[in-house]
Amino acid sequence: LQSVGIKVISPVYANTNLDAPAIPASMYSAFETDGYSIFDMGGDDAGATVMGQFIKNIKDKQYDILYVINKTRSMIENEKEAQEMLLSIEKASRLKATYIVNNTHLKDYTDAKMIFESVSYAKKVSVLLKLDILCTTYPKKIMTSNDIRAYGEILYDLYPVEVFVKTPWEAIEGGRNIWQEQ
């Protein structure tokens, strides 16, 4: 992300196997900027709990909380599970989601049909949560929006994304994981 001009503030234990909610003091600088700040709370209440400590910095500002769903992710494979997960995230963070982003994928195994079929799941989640769908993402390296639309009409914005995140088994160089050198 830094290579494309994005300032990254991350916990000391980021990119390790430790899942400790340690936040660096530099995190507060994100609330002092005139531009946009984006926080990745993770996909459950653990990361959201950490975000909850910043409620005083957030509550009086204009913000959007995007609830990013992935139909292929365990624990939110159906709309009821997605609802329960969001409720736990909102309770832990003390913030309310404002939009849904349908980010269904299986990394390089994603195809246009999977994206198209995920839209009906996203619609069901949207109705249940009473939240609008902001967009449906697709990996631009693998397909185009026309590939997805070939399966039928989609009323939501299709948003191409470039994938920067690598799984631990993708990040191996010369027998060492890249994160071990950070």
Language model region names:
Residues 10-16, 35-51:
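Switch II (G3) loop of P-loop NTPases
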Residues 45-153:
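Conserved catalytic-core segment of NTP-binding enzymes
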Residues 30-37, 61:
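Glycine-rich phosphate-binding loop signature in dinucleotide/nucleotide-binding domains
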Residues 6, 63, 158:
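Short, conserved active-site loop motifs that form the nucleotide-linked donor/cofactor pocket
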Residues 130-139, 143-182:
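NTP-binding/hydrolysis catalytic cores, primarily Walker-type P-loop NTPases
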Residues 1-19, 26, 152:
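N-terminal phosphate/diphosphate-binding loop that engages ATP/GTP or pyrophosphate donors
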Residues 13-15, 71-72, 164-165:
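Short, acidic/turn-prone active-site loops that include or flank metal/cofactor-
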